[in-house]
């Protein structure tokens, strides 16, 4: 078996997993990194035929691009935008294949039924933990199961800790997915454990964990930051009784999922929380970032980040900055960069003052560990070269096979992001003092005097680097890899002015960097991919480089699993040594161990819940007994007589209620709730309004954040004007979004300015009605009440309004000067300006129109009155006109007495112009 075949061969647990996925319709929950791209590729490949029509939901752009490239099949399509029209998609669906599609497009196609839904082979749902009862994905599966009882549904999730949030989330996800069984694949699964734990030779499983000690200053900083975290958590639990849970503690406050845990407890009470509690939540986020930076960044970058969070502007936003612990953190951070020289005995005896601190930055302990690992690797490479040479001389028959084996050991260092990759590369090539000096020299936050010799060295280095040279660094992979810079560090940490440290676009697009000053290949690779544009990049790097030594610079659970699987897959061909760097008794170690503990706890609870779960027989909706498929127009308070009464809920086609919905609204859960109430939805591209309930009622839906933005920019006034022009009963719906409460923060100025602007809006548009809704469930009930006994809206009329409002106007048809002038007139907007341009041949003709003529042209009496008043009102008030007339008479009387006037007077309409008469002397 060659190396390529070894890299593509599936392990034993992967083979069993592939068969289970193909034959079973279940919810599969995996530990991080257990579900590999190789298994998914083989699953997708099984459905890339003309006889299959399979939709894949929840895939990121990077995953879609990866699988399209790897499958290399004409039956694999990506529909993520409106580039394919409805008729084109209909033809594509008819030809079959595998479709990576967005939920918004698929839900519209299912509602319009542009293809036979019963012909769909199945739906594959990725990231199933994100599905909610009224989400787009749940809406799609409900529409799918209503018309298709035979097709499969398969759901995957690699985030088991998400099932710990909320009450019985596993059962709710299975119910929304119409799945009766769940398959759990933790790391301690017997098959997974057997496949990854290599038996026999210890060299195949050689992993070296290097535990580093924190320096004295780092330990001081960590202790004080942890004190601030503990105090903030206890104070937060005191202020918010809903957080009195054992899960809310200082340990979980350090994890990345703490915000989700807080959201699960506080979403319902966010509006009742005072500003002090919100400030504490923001402070906890800052503490978590600083504790992460402490072990990840060098001393200069950490101090620069700390300066950003402790600046004078931040004192008014966070009270922790003036605490004693914060002062100790700042002093210790500065002490890592500047060292105070010790006094000599003579200076101590004479009582001399303290000497000026000198620039002696603390070297990152992990940098020193990497240097030792590389030196050890180089020695092994030299030893390996000698052994190969000896074996070649002793046995000529085996020389051909030995020649295939490279004597150099390739080293791959995994870091978290591109910034760490660049700084570590500079350290390995230039040394720590030069890198630190470069960061300080180019920082706006740090005011430290560098030694003159170091400044001269940096300046000469900058001049040398400005010349074209490929001496040290080269791009090792030309393939585009859009690695976005993650939450890596401060914006002003010294990386913004020097090209060797700056994260440039070229560095962002690199897969990895090769440091060429060493005798053996050394590559540095960032594994964090926040933009999700390069999925499965770690596995691709491992397979393409096939490193002999792997160094995990920043510990990450998913990265460790991916390396573990790669080692097991390459074990027959290659012995891989792995170095794991971590600080002993540090927050970094605690976060890593906590992630393992939480994942194990999640699977233990999932196993218990699975064992005690009661699943109804109709869960998979193979018949009409599943109540989740019923479309019930009645209220929750109405009594249900019997299970057979659901037949009476289905109305006849003639009595069906219809609501016209703008396609952009399908991002919310309101369309799903309306459909569940027995109301048919007609997706359209509406230019006026978001929901058309009746021929007379048009609704514009706004969340609180959208409302503030629309009021500030004036967009809401134009929308209200358009609704009032075409509908008798325009409605502004202000809906409170539950999910956006924790992340949305409004300033006091925004909230205080909303009411006056709403008052102005209602005064200008008296027919506009406002509805305040606490949530989508209440909104759906209000819509149903508003539609009772009313006529159904016509899609043709709504589209006619859209065409009339937008129209097709050629910009070169109109003179740009009067067009621009007219656009600035009161009452004129981008829609009705063309009505004036088409009616009037000139501005003179416009000025001669009566107010009634303007009303007929604009089809709006209010707009016509505003425009007419702007054209014909006097420019001066009555008092100003009287003063001007009196002044004109006095000037004329004065001129009659003067033989040689000093001023030339020009009388304009309602205005006097005085010009010095200098030319009269000539």
Question: What annotation goes with each model-predicted range?
Answer:
Residues 125-128, 554:
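Walker B catalytic acidic pair
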Residues 133-134, 426-615, 619:
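Conserved RecA-like P-loop NTPase helicase motor core
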Residues 95, 111-122, 539-545:
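Short basic/glycine-enriched coil/helix segment immediately N-terminal to the Walker B
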Residues 72-106:
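Inter-Walker segment of RecA-like/P-loop motor cores
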Residues 657-659, 663-668, 672, 680-827, ...:
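Extended, alpha-helix-rich binding/interface surfaces that flank or overlap catalytic cores
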């Amino acid at each position: 078996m060659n190396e390529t075949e070894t890299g593509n061969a599936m392990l034993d647990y992967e083979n069993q997993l592939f068969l289970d996925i193909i034959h079973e319709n279940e919810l599969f929950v995996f530990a991080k990194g257990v579900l590999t791209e190789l298994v998914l590729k083989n699953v997708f490949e099984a459905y890339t035929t003309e006889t299959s029509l399979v939709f894949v939901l929840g895939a990121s752009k990077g995953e879609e691009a990866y699988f399209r490239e790897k499958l290399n099949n004409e039956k694999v399509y990506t529909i993520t935008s409106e580039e394919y029209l409805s008729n084109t998609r209909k033809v594509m669906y008819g030809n079959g294949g595998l479709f990576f599609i967005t939920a918004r497009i698929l839900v519209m196609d299912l509602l319009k039924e542009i293809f036979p839904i019963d012909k769909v082979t199945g739906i594959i749902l990725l990231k199933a933990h994100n599905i909610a009862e009224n989400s787009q994905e749940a809406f799609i599966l409900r529409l799918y199961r209503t018309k298709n009882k035979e097709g499969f549904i398969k759901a995957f999730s690699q985030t088991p800790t998400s099932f710990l949030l909320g009450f019985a989330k596993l059962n709710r996800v299975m119910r929304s997915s119409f799945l009766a069984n769940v398959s759990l694949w933790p790391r301690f699964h017997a098959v997974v454990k057997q496949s990854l734990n290599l038996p026999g030779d210890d060299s195949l499983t050689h992993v070296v964990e290097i535990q580093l000690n924190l320096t004295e200053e780092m330990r001081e900083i960590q202790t004080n930051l942890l004190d601030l975290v503990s105090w903030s958590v206890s104070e937060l639990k005191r202020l918010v009784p809903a957080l009195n849970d054992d899960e809310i503690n200082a340990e979980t406050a350090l994890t990345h999922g703490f915000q989700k845990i807080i959201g699960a407890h506080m979403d319902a009470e966010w509006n009742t929380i005072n500003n002090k509690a919100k400030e504490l939540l923001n402070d906890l986020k800052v503490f978590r970032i600083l504790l992460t930076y402490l072990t990840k960044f060098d001393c200069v970058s950490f101090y620069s980040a700390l300066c950003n969070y402790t600046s004078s502007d931040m004192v008014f936003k966070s009270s922790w900055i003036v605490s004693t612990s914060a002062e100790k953190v700042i002093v210790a951070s500065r002490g890592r960069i500047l060292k105070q020289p010790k006094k000599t005995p003579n200076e101590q005896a004479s009582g001399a003052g303290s000497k000026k601190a000198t620039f002696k930055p603390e070297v990152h302990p992990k940098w020193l560990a990497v240097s030792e690992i590389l030196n050890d690797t180089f020695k092994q490479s030299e030893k390996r070269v000698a052994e190969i040479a000896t074996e070649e001389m002793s046995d000529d028959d085996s020389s051909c096979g030995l020649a295939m084996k490279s004597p150099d050991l390739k080293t791959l260092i995994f870091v978290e992001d591109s910034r760490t990759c660049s700084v570590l590369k500079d350290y390995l090539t230039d040394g720590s003092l030069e890198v630190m000096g470069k960061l300080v020299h180019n920082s706006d936050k740090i005011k430290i005097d560098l030694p003159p010799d170091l400044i001269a060295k940096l300046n000469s280095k900058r001049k040398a680097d400005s010349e074209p040279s490929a001496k040290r660094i080269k791009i090792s992979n030309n393939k585009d890899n859009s690695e976005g810079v993650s939450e890596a560090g401060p914006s002003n940490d010294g990386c913004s002015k020097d090209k060797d440290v700056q994260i440039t676009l070229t560095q962002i697009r690199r897969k990895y960097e090769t440091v060429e000053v060493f005798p053996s290949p050394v590559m540095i690779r960032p594994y964090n991919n926040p933009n999700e544009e390069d999925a499965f990049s770690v596995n691709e790097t491992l397979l393409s480089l096939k490193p002999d030594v792997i160094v995990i610079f920043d510990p990450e659970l998913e990265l460790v699993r991916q390396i573990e699987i790669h080692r097991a897959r390459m074990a027959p061909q290659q012995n891989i040594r792995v170095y794991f760097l971590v600080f002993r008794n540090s927050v970094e170690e605690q976060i890593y161990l906590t992630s393992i503990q939480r994942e194990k706890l999640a699977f233990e609870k999932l196993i218990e819940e699975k064992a005690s779960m009661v699943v109804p027989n109709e869960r998979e909706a193979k018949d009409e007994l599943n109540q989740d498929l019923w479309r019930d127009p009645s209220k929750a308070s109405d009594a249900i007589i019997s299970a057979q009464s659901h037949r009476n809920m289905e109305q006849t086609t003639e009595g069906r209620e219809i609501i016209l919905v703008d396609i952009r609204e399908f991002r919310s859960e309101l369309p799903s709730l309306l459909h569940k109430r027995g109301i048919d939805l007609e997706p359209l591209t509406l230019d006026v309004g978001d929901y058309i309930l009746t021929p007379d009622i048009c609704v514009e839906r706004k969340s609180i954040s959208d409302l503030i933005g629309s009021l500030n920019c004036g967009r809401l006034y134009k929308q209200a004007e358009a609704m009032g022009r075409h509908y008798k009963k325009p409605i502004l719906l202000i809906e409170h979004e539950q999910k956006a409460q924790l992340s949305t923060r409004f300033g006091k100025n925004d909230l205080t300015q909303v009411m006056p602007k709403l008052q102005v809006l209602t005064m200008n548009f008296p027919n506009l009605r406002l509805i305040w809704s606490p949530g989508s469930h209440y909104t759906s009930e209000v819509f149903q009440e508003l539609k009772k006994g009313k006529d159904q809206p016509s899609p043709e009329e709504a589209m006619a309004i859209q065409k009339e409002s937008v129209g097709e106007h050629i910009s070169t048809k109109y003179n740009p000067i009067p067009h621009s002038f007219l656009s600035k007139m009161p009452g004129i907007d981008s829609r009705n300006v063309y009505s004036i341009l088409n009616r009037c041949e000139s501005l003179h003709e416009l000025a001669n129109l009566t107010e009634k003529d303007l009303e007929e042209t604009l089809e709006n009496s209010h707009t016509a009155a505003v425009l007419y008043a702007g054209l014909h009102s006097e420019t001066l008030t009555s008092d100003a006109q009287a003063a001007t007339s009196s002044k004109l008479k006095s000037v004329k009387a004065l001129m009659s007495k003067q033989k040689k006037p000093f001023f030339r007077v020009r009388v304009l309409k309602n205005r006097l112009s005085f010009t010095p008469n200098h030319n009269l002397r000539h």
